[in-house]
Amino acid sequence: MPRVLVANRGEIAIRVFRAAVELGWNTVALFTENDSSHATYADERIQLDGPLDYMNVQKIVECAINSKATHLHPGYGYLSESPELASACFSDNIVFIGPSPETLRIASDKMRSRELAISLNVPVAAGKRVNSAEDVIELARGVQFPVMIKALDGGGGRGIRICESENEVGEAFKRCLGESPSRQLFAEKALKGPGWKHVEIQIVGDGHEVVHLWERECSVQRRFQKIVETAPSSLPRSSVQPLIDSAMKMAAALQYRSLGTFEFMVNATTENWVFLEINPRVQVEHTVTEEITNTDLVQAQLKLSLPSNTLSSLSLSSKQMLPTGYAVQLRLTAEDPAKAFQLSPGAIRPEDIAWPAGRGIRIDTWLSSLEGQLFTVGTDFDSLLAKVIVHGASFEEATQKAKRALKELRLNANVQTNAAVLHGLLEHPDWSSGGIDTLWLERNLDSVLGLGKPATSNFQTGVASAVPTSTTSSASSYVTLQPGTIFHLNLFSNEKPSDTSTSHTMTLSSIALNTFPERLSGTLQTSFSGLGVVNFDLSQSTSSASTAALELADPNNPSHVGSPLTGKVVELHSALSGSDGGGRIRKGETIAVLSVMKMESVVSAPRDGWVARVPKGVKVGVVVGEGTLLAVFEDRSRL
């Protein structure tokens, strides 16, 4: 019996486990200490040392060998497009569920896949590999700004920046380099005009024959991250057919095996189109293709990894899988639209969630466990909470079903979401008319939020209960915390037993860092009888020394520079390298770089000044919360 190890986490791991179990396969999960909900769906579980192990080829293969896995499914992201992982599996007689290493060396490399397209007369945007900011500027002088810098191995919006002028190139190049695992980049002419839609073709191959499973449209994006996907596309068939033909031609040239997606940009006005890239793996949005073709794509992947199976034997052909109806996928993320879509970390209890249900509604999420546990949203992984997938006989029916699904969805936790954006999008007239391009959301965000907020006024009604219902020793881990939460506690003397207690009130007045129950620091405002109001610094006893040493910035103190978001410090200005400060920083200089969900955000100096002090906890590798004090400035010109 096949035994598959899934080298991934979250909803995609659960998706693969479910598909494998239905085929009678044994399953093995990898998990980390504070992220294990997906592992409850597997037969065997292996704990990793930390999130970085998901990117460690040697560690992943070692886990597969030790668990006696016959197959390895990489999911999406992480090492899913790694020819090194595929080769290592082959060397150790483990079946890699995906394309061959030879195919991956071309398909996962954006430059080599462009070269393949060019050799087959498939149009691409002007571009080249770049090793420096100067290379980008040289390209721009030939094709004119704007240009786009991309990581060769980027994805999910990571490793991508648009430059409108020369003075933006240096910082953009540096950030893309930091977000690229291979630290390899290329640049191309950016397609920023109105009307450009993102359309992708789903193919599946057995190494000899290739078929397509129609197209998906992914034009609803923000900062190159897909938010909503539909199938089929809103474009006329005459605009889609050349994309299908090109995808089939390229896949055939690669002798493609397993699932693959070929991405294109199409201008709905001019009908111009170009090839973008190949995603040689299962996509986040594979669900909408499954809905319109009534095909389990993940099971198809698993079956095609067995040498006896072919497309023909599995009855997989485009003629047999004609699209039926329309499907929409809405990505619910832990991002706060009111704060420029910053990650909203926090804890979610199972009882805080209510998912929509009914015919034609499907939920793929990691906020699900066979054992019941606290879910923690942190900075180590992406912000995706759930995928809400609907299917209807028509586009209008699918839209109405999506509206109902969002209306029924409840998340009563301190984690903010993009629900208002999803609601507002479906209410906007451009959604119904098909008038959405890849920059539409950025142009129309205010109106989208205006339409969406009334529909989500009751979406997050706050903490269901500040007091845990359980009285066991582990109950404290089920307390959901946010500023303003009031605790009613009974305090007993440690000196002698007592049958009486005095009631006091404690209010969590501010939070420096909250990825509770993993870490928490902030300020408690406490009212004691006869003593008035007393403020206490709050930190978990299990916190690291560096976390406990973090401080909150005072927004009213002009000398304080606070973190605008929650993230891991990956770079600090040399002037912040010591707690005593002393270095000079000019306005606009980068004082810190924070990594959030593998994307880097720059914190710039708001003014000229000298660093007078740096909190002891601020150092590379530490997770800081929104509002955490990064440095104290002083203006020596006044001395």
Predicted segment positions?
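Extreme N-terminal starter segment of soluble prokaryotic enzymes
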Residues: 1-3
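ATP-dependent carboxylate activation and anion-phosphoryl transfer catalytic cores
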Residues: 6-27, 33, 42-47, 65-67, ...
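Conserved N-proximal alpha/beta basic substrate-recognition cap immediately N-terminal to
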Residues: 8, 51-122
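Short, ordered loop/turn segments at secondary-structure junctions
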Residues: 9-10, 31-35, 50, 76-77, ...
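Flexible, low-complexity "carrier/transfer arms" centered on conserved reactive residues
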Residues: 32, 337, 352, 422-423, ...
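Conserved thiamine diphosphate
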Residues: 112-130, 160, 234-238
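Short acidic loop-to-helix transition motifs that present clustered carboxylates
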Residues: 129-136, 168, 192-195, 568, ...
